[in-house]
């Protein structure tokens, strides 16, 4: 009855582990403000640097393998560290069951902040409870 939760670089690490490893007991995956590709995010930070990185660990390579485990992606649309389009791309590559929450004025890893926690915490708890108790 594990729920895996990854923020930022933790997201691709979780996706890589699920794609390559044992998934037994994993009931849900939540990714907050993560990125789809190491090279893409590196190029956004330092133009031209992406070609130096090994893309074999990028989340976009493994996101489809999460299914049938329920997946929740969360991202702030005002994130200036990792653009929200990364979560949108991961969502488009993922298989059902999946859910995407975009926080209109949310910044980087802002879903649990004082500013947004009350709004999104309930949705996240509902997602977890639904994943742990799929009969309800």
Q: Model-flagged regions — what are they?
A:
Residues 78-82, 109-110:
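Acidic catalytic loop of the alpha/beta-hydrolase fold
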